[in-house]
Amino acid sequence: MSAEYGIARGTGWVALLQQRIKDNKFDVRVVNASISGDTTSGGLNRFTKLVNEKKPAVVIVELGANDGLRGLPLTSAEKNIFSIINKSKSAGAKVLLIGMQIPPNYGPMYTDQFVAMYKKIAREAKVPLVPFLLEGVADKAEFFQADQLHPTAAAHPQILNNVWPCLLPMISK
């Protein structure tokens, strides 16, 4: 969602976040390291270099949807997300975890376990959680591209509004 798949560059929620930060006069620079189609494994593989180069104060972890859409083992996704969180904390960064939901293609047990995974990670890692990035978006067909997976540019202000209340205390201190 964060890589602006299928929408014009600069219209996604991360670009809107940078503008909101600027409008609120916070001295914060946003680095969007998202790659469209990325899995937790891919994110973890790139993360050590990124965290060492960028030295972030806050890391937003928004990964896992592609693992779920591919039916990958949730134990692997969970382990990878925990690793990213732990590496972030070791580098001195605060962490915000973004939860997702997936279509019921793999059955209710997998779908329910997928949602529960984010809650478990947030609880055990003691990090704040945005329970569902697409709250207020997922139930509106007009907010989705033809693939019915990726939001249109019109949905991204709502996506930012879902993240902002949890992120604001982390960047305003």
Feature locations, PLM:
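Conserved donor sugar-nucleotide recognition element shared by glycan-biosynthetic enzymes
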Residues: 10-13, 39-43
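Single-residue recognition of alpha-helix boundary sites
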Residues: 9-10, 110
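Short glycine-rich His-centered loop
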Residues: 1-6
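Residue-level detector of alpha-helical segments with a strong bias toward transmembrane helices
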Residues: 8-9, 157
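Alpha-helical cap/lid subdomain in secreted, periplasmic
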Residues: 16-26, 42-173
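A short beta-strand-loop structural module common to alpha/beta enzyme folds
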Residues: 26-39
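Short, surface-exposed alpha-helical recognition segments that flank or form part
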Residues: 8, 35-38, 72, 151
